[in-house]
Amino acid sequence: MGKQVDSKTITWVIENFSSLQSASIHSDQFVVGDCKWRLKAYPKGNEKATYLAYRANNLALYLNVANSKSFPIGWTRHTKFSLTLVNQKSEKLSKLTESQHWFDHKSTSRGFPAMIPLTNLHTNEGFLVNGELTLVAKVEVLEVVGKLDVSKKSSPVMETIDVNGFQVLPQIESVNRLFAKHLDIASKFRPKKPYMKTAYMNVLLSLTKTLCQSPQDLSNDDISGAGAALTYLREAGFKLDWLEKKHGEIKEKKKKEEASLKRLQEMEKQIFNEAQIYKEKVLAARAPLSLNEDNVF
């Protein structure tokens, strides 16, 4: 039996959460304590949960051993872990749950079948921002029995890297470019906890990606959502003058596009109607005259 303490904190951003159709989804794998792990979520509830009341209308979230079949007989992992459902508007409203468990071949999954009622998730402001749900997992392996030569390299989607005090997912180049072009972007940023910083940065990157698209590719809902995201980020202390200007330009272009499209459709309809009138006149002019005997003789 080997004693060791190995820990890792990962962030899982679930996009388009409200429109997910799958009964369950899982994160990419990550390595802690010579073991591959992943998070598994049930967006509409775990129908196999022990307690009937937990089976529906709750977000269920679990920590799973991803490579359990590869371990030797008798393997175990004594693990302490926490799962945080991030409220991106107020860290005080974030939901933290903790557990300690011996994982083995009979018990490869541990978690929380009622992390939060879905009604609370969808109605409370801050958990879902731009359709994204952010989860943070801290996994500490306290004791190891049975080792495998597993790669320490985790999926780049999961690892976080420090950039100007922000623990960011591997959009590191995008974040570096933001800070290089806008040095004071976060000079008045208030939240201090790492997972809150990560959540805000994810919103900022998503917003930047949205505003880089052509107005033609954006719906009015997209533009409205971008405006809400700007307000949300500005209230946290981000300085985003250039994005606000970009958002205003996109709104104006979208209005002009819609006005021009409406006028074009009106003109096409008018031309079509006029064409129908002239078509009828042409057909009438081509029609042969009918003659009877009284007209001829």
UniProtKB/Swiss-Prot annotation:
Residues 239-281 form a coiled coil. Signal peptide: none annotated. Pfam families: MATH_2 (PF22486). SUPFAM superfamilies: TRAF domain-like. Residues 7-139 form the MATH domain. The keyword tRNA-binding does not apply. Keywords: Coiled coil. It comes from the Eukaryota. PANTHER family: TRAF-LIKE SUPERFAMILY PROTEIN, UBIQUITIN-SPECIFIC PROTEASE FAMILY C19-RELATED PROTEIN. This is MATH domain and coiled-coil domain-containing protein At2g05420. It comes from Arabidopsis thaliana.
